[in-house]
Structure formats: C-alpha cells, structure tokens
Design a protein with these regions (language model features):
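Helix-loop boundary and gating motifs at the non-cytosolic
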Residues: 1-70, 224-265
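Juxtamembrane intracellular "pre-TM" segments in multi-pass secondary transporters
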Residues: 1-11, 192-230
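Hydrophobic core of transmembrane alpha-helices in multi-pass small-molecule transporters
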Residues: 22, 101-117, 318-337
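Transmembrane alpha-helix termini and helix-breaking/packing motifs in multi-pass membrane transporters
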Residues: 33-41, 68, 72, 95, ...
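Helix-to-loop junctions at the C-terminal end of transmembrane segments
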Residues: 62-75, 160, 275-289, 381
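Cytoplasmic membrane-interface "Motif A"-like loop-to-helix N-cap segments
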Residues: 71-84, 285-300
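C-terminal ends and interior cores of transmembrane alpha-helices
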Residues: 84-99, 298-317
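Intracellular juxtamembrane helix-capping segments at the cytosolic ends
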Residues: 116-129, 336-351
C-alpha cells in the first residue's frame, strides 16, 4: 500500500491498523472455525450450537453502553488495553478447557469485549482517515488480516486432523495474537474534535439509561440510518439463523474432516475477502450504502440456496461437496461487501457526529436479531428439517436486498 497520498496522522494510523490487522487475522480464523471445533472436538449438542450462535450477537447488546463510555472518555487508548487483557488473553484458559459449556462461557467473554472494540475502532476510522481514503485503507487491512487467517486456518486444520486436542494450543496462540492486535490499536493517537466538550460524569442510573434513550432518539431523528438498520436486521435474520445448523450440515451430513471443514469455512470463504476487499472498499466510498448492500444481500441469498442443492445431492458425495464449496465461495464474495458495509456504513450516516455511538447502536441491533434468529433456525430444524432453514434464510436475504433498493429510490439519493 502507498502512503504518499496520506497526511502524517493518516500514515501513523494506517501503519498501526495494518500491523494490528496482521495479528488480528488469527482472531478471524477462530471466528470462522469455532463452531467446527465445538461440534467435532467438544461434541456440542444442537442446543449448545444454538446458544453458541447467539453468543456473538447477544453480547453485542453491550455495544451502546461501551460506545457511550468510549465517546465520553478522555483516555480512549485504555479501552483497547482492556479488550486485549480481558477479551483476548482470557483465551489462555483454553489450556485447561474440558467441556463445551466452558467453551461457550469463554467465547462469551471474548465477544463481550469485542463489542467494545468495534465502536472504538470506528472512531479511529472516522477521525483519523479522510472519508475518500477510508474504504480503500479498510480494504487493505481486511485483506492482510484474511491472508493471515487463511494460512493459520489451513495449518490449524491439518494439525487438528493429526491431534484433535491441539485446539487448546490454537486457543493459546489466538490469545497472544489477539492481545497484540488490541495493544497496537491502543498506540494510535485519536484526533480530538476541536470543539469537543469535556463530558460531565454521569450517575450510575444515567450511565445505564442514557445510551438506551439516545439510541431511540437517534433512530427516530435519523430516518435513513433507521432504514439502514432495518435492512441489516432482515439480512441478519437470514445470516444468523443458519449458523447453528451449518456445523451439523458440514460435520454430520457431509462428514468433512477438520481440514475439509476449515477449507470451506476458513479458506474458500475468506479468499474473496483477501483479493476483493481493497476494490470493494473503494467502490463503497463511491456508492451510497443502500445501493451497496442491495447488491451484496442479493448475492448472499445464493449461499443458502446452493447449500440446499448440496443437501439434495448427498448420495453423490463429490457433487455435494463441490456444491458446498461453491456456496462458500459465493458466501465469501458476498460477505466481503457486507462486512465493509457493516463496519463502514454507520460512519456515513453519522456525518459529523461521533461514529462510535452510531456503530454502538448498529452492533447492538445485532443482539436483538441474535436472540430470535438462532431460535427460529432451531425451530425449523426440529419441525421441518435442515433444508427448510436454508430456504427460509435465502428468502430473508432476498427481502433485505429488495427493501434496500426501495429505500435507495424512496430517499431520492
């Protein structure tokens, strides 16, 4: 990446963001493979996989409080240290991990502090990087992180096929790399607003209620942002509801090894992010978010549809596996765009306001659908079968795409 077009602050920020992304790639690998580890190594039951799928989105409920605290703080770097120590080094407990319930608690702790890092990191992007350069630089950080994730995922898959208990060592390595990634973010000098007031200290009651009131006010006054959240909520229902059943499909029905599973979830699905992120990031800078998400929600609808095709051709194993791998390739392309919009979209709607609060609301909304979607997936799995879960998910994604396009036309943007 060339730094000559960046001012000194942008260069300082971009370098540290890239170094952080390098180490965060190992965290990305864990995010993609945790459910396979749960099903194969820890023999997770269906209800545990459902809870596992809920942990990430439900822990995001904390984001509006984290975002508000971060917005008011005069010492922002300390929060990245907090993420590193409690939300990353806690994975060291993996050395003594013996059961699935412990693994769920551990991942709950990790994702709870992740809900602090996301809005905090958005403040860095908003204040330190010019809007015309933001998407492209973000794309490079994603590509670098994904490159590390792909390499680490392949090595981890091969290691686990040789010795399943090595997942404990993998968690330990992830702890160290995750801490370094968070520590590097703490070194970034966040540009302060020239007119930023010194925030008065809030009472405990105000600390608990103020973010909720502000969230409702924000969604009420900023109609385009509320429409953006509506589209993402519909998309999220389709995306999250398949998460508990994916490991069941890959492990129990396709009977893939660790390497086979990790190739699908951690390599094929990630390679498009590796190569496309800088280009789609630049494209995101030029398009309105509604147009952008319309395209990628629609493309993502093909993923569960292809999984249905794979499930219907199980007696032809090679064809079934090939269709599943094609599905994950489509997933990778679509999610490259969705992830860029998920992380950058709220900055667009924030305008000159603090992006951390907007992203806090955005992340917290994930928690609402995170309660409903996995339960809906489990209900469909138990009553009508696994194929219906993917079919309904595809319908949600198509609906999100159509509504996003209608919102774009309705707002005359």
């Amino acid at each position: 990446m060339r730094f000559k077009n960046l001012n000194p602050l942008e260069q300082h920020t971009a370098r540290l963001l890239l170094w952080s992304a390098l180490f965060n790639g190992v965290m990305i690998s864990l995010n993609q493979t945790q459910d396979i580890i749960a099903r194969k190594a820890l023999h997770a039951e269906v209800w545990q996989l459902t809870v596992m799928a809920m942990i990430w989105p439900v822990s995001n409920f904390l984001s509006i409080w984290w975002g508000r605290i971060f917005e008011k703080s005069q010492h922002k770097s300390r929060y990245f240290i907090l993420v590193g120590v409690l939300g990353r080094l806690s994975l060291f407990y993996g050395l003594w991990l013996t059961g699935m319930n412990e693994f769920m608690l551990l991942m709950g702790l990790v994702f709870s502090f992740n809900s602090l890092q996301i809005p905090a990191q958005n403040t860095i992007w908003q204040r330190n990087i010019d809007s015309g350069k933001r998407g492209k630089i973000y794309g490079y950080t994603i590509s670098l992180g994904v490159f590390v994730a792909v390499v680490f995922t392949f090595i981890a898959g091969r290691a686990l096929d040789r010795n399943e208990n090595l997942f404990r060592l993998i968690l330990t390595i992830t702890a160290v790399c995750g801490f370094i990634a968070a520590f590097l973010l703490s070194l970034i000098r966040i540009k302060e607003k020239p007119d930023e007031p010194i925030h008065p200290k809030l009472s405990l009651k105000e600390t608990l209620t103020d973010p909720i009131k502000r969230t409702l006010t924000l969604l009420k006054k900023n109609k385009p942002f509320a429409a953006f959240e509506r589209s993402f909520s519909i998309y999220g229902m389709g995306f999250i509801m398949v998460q508990p059943v994916l490991p069941i499909f890959l492990v129990d029905m396709l009977k893939l090894s660790y390497t086979g599973n990790f190739i699908a979830k951690g390599i094929i699905s990630q390679i498009p992010m590796l190569f496309l992120s800088p280009y789609l990031g630049k494209w995101h800078d030029k398009l309105h978010p509604f147009r952008f998400i319309c395209v990628f929600f629609g493309l993502l609808a093909l993923f569960p549809a292809l999984i249905v095709c794979s499930a219907l051709t199980l007696k032809w194993h090679l064809l079934s596996v090939t269709l599943a791998y094609v599905a994950f390739a489509v997933f990778g392309v679509a999610m490259t765009g969705v992830n860029i919009a998920w992380n950058m979209g709220s900055i667009f709607f924030a305008g000159k306001e603090d992006a951390s609060m907007y992203q806090g609301v955005h992340v917290t909304m994930t928690g609402i659908r995170g309660i409903l979607a996995p339960l809906l997936g489990l209900l469909l799995l138990k009553t009508t079968g696994i194929i219906s879960v993917f079919a309904v998910a595809s319908c949600f994604l198509i609906t999100a795409s159509i509504i996003s396009w209608r919102d774009y036309k309705r707002l005359h943007i």
